[in-house]
Design a protein with these regions (language model features):
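Domain-level signature for soluble enzymes in the chorismate/prephenate branch of the shikimate pathway
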Residues: 1-274
Length: 274
């Protein structure tokens, strides 16, 4: 059953055949998918109501966090994380048939296939999107160019799959946030995960004190990442996800964090991916 029947258009970053489009289709199989060239453009489309929601990658099990999406969640107002989907990533080397000496793909995909490329002496060439790289190879007709993308991209752009499952880790997967317009939900029934970010007070031990807000209440953090705060040397913004087993304890932890940190932004409270 479609969890969001009123959503008819869902955005993603990339071109048709991108992993992000696959994730969007998995979440909203009946909605029209709309690709955007950048994450910023996807957020703009959400704000202007060009799309009802956007499915955007926030972290990969090999490559780590997707910094730009996390930064935009902090910077943009009027949006929230209302769900998530974990999508397996199975990279393929695509080409026209001749030996590949250069592989075009998104930097994250290149990083995830580093061992495969190095073992074969294939040059990694950064491109804005995996599916876009496949399209460029198909249209460019440059000898020796190949792309790292999905099997779906190979089919869409008429390329051959030269090698499958070339990622360094077979458990490679990406977690996508379902972002829509609205106010982030508070902990409550049926909502089992929280995503937020905070800036710690600029004093010794501030991060430890902030994290104590969770540990004292038996809350399990499933993610903790940090990013430098622009124009504030040695200040950091921390990104946190945690599981909700007790909604009251989760609410208390959020209140305690607001007292301890300089700034807190709740991205959303939502059902965790199964």
């Amino acid at each position: 059953m479609d969890p969001h029947p009123s959503w008819t258009r869902v955005g993603y970053q990339g071109e048709p055949g991108a992993y992000s489009e696959e994730a969007a289709i998995a979440v909203l199989p009946k909605a029209t998918t709309v690709g955007f060239p950048t994450f910023t453009r996807a957020f703009d489309a959400l704000a202007s109501r060009e799309v009802d929601a956007a499915v955007l990658p926030v972290e990969n099990s090999l490559g780590g966090i997707v910094q730009e999406v996390n930064d935009l969640l902090w910077e943009r107002s009027g949006v929230r994380v209302s769900g998530e989907v974990v999508h397996p990533v199975r990279h393929c080397l695509l080409g026209r048939g001749e030996p590949v000496v250069r592989a075009l793909s998104h930097p994250q995909a290149l990083l995830q296939c580093r061992k495969f490329l190095e073992a074969r002496g294939i040059q990694a060439v950064s491109f804005h999107d995996t599916a876009g790289a496949a399209r460029a190879v198909a249209e460019g007709m440059v000898m020796g160019n190949g792309a790292i993308a999905s099997a779906a991209a190979a089919k869409r752009y008429g390329l051959k799959i030269l090698a499958e499952g070339i990622q360094d880790d077979d458990t490679n997967q990406t977690r996508f946030a379902i972002v829509d317009r609205g106010t982030p939900a508070k902990p409550g029934p049926g909502l089992t995960k929280v995503s937020l970010a905070f800036i710690g007070a600029h004093r010794p031990g501030s991060r430890v004190h902030a994290l104590t807000c969770f540990s004292e209440r038996g809350i399990n953090l499933t993610r903790l990442d940090s990013r430098p705060v622009p124009n504030q040397p040695w200040q950091y913004r921390f990104y946190v996800d945690f599981e909700i087993s007790d909604p009251q304890a989760a609410s208390e932890a959020l209140r305690a964090l607001e007292e301890e940190a300089t700034e807190v932004k709740l991205f959303g409270t939502y059902p965790a991916a199964e």
